[in-house]
Amino acid sequence: MQIILLEKVINLGNLGDIVKVKDGYARNFLIPSKKARRATQTAIQEFEVKRAELEKAAAEKLAAAQAEGEKLNGQTVQISQKSGVDGRLFGSVTNADIAIALGTQGFKVEKAQVRLPNGPLKTVGEHPVAVALHTDVVVDVTVAVVGEQV
């Protein structure tokens, strides 16, 4: 299916690109989440009329994400979990836990924005974590996991 991207999509393209994707990806994800639209002649003409407006909105989102990223970059978040004697946690620290902890510090971060490439944190100590505020803005945060002896 041919679609027009209404915003930048990772591994697919930028605003205004006309790309071919599988029908299910377009129907079930891109179109319902307002990231794309079917590439018909009328849709292409309507997009060209709204292009400047969409580019301005995308630039504003990027500027807001960069401003938030400057505040968030290098922050340390402390999370306490029950742990054993050997420093391994009972359970784990997930991206949702990190997003909640950042929220208590005044940062608006959703759990989908927290990137844990090696999976949930399962040991006590400091762990570097990437937070993707925008497709072009990724900042590093240190998560200090403190163990509570049981």
From Swiss-Prot:
An example Gene Ontology molecular-function term: structural constituent of ribosome
UniProt xrefs under PROSITE patterns: RIBOSOMAL_L9
Record flagged with keyword Hydrolase: no
Chloroplast is among the record's keywords: no
One Pfam family here: Ribosomal_L9_N
GO cellular component: ribonucleoprotein complex; ribosome
Entry's Gene Ontology BP terms: translation
Entry-linked InterPro entries: Ribosomal_bL9, Ribosomal_bL9/RNase_H1_N, Ribosomal_bL9_bac/chp, Ribosomal_bL9_C, Ribosomal_bL9_C_sf, Ribosomal_bL9_N, Ribosomal_bL9_N_sf
Superkingdom assignment: Bacteria
Keywords: Ribonucleoprotein, Ribosomal protein, RNA-binding, rRNA-binding
NCBIfam families: L9
Function: Binds to the 23S rRNA.
Family stated for the protein in its record: Belongs to the bacterial ribosomal protein bL9 family.
The protein, known as: Large ribosomal subunit protein bL9
Originating organism: Cupriavidus pinatubonensis (strain JMP 134 / LMG 1197) (Cupriavidus necator (strain JMP 134))
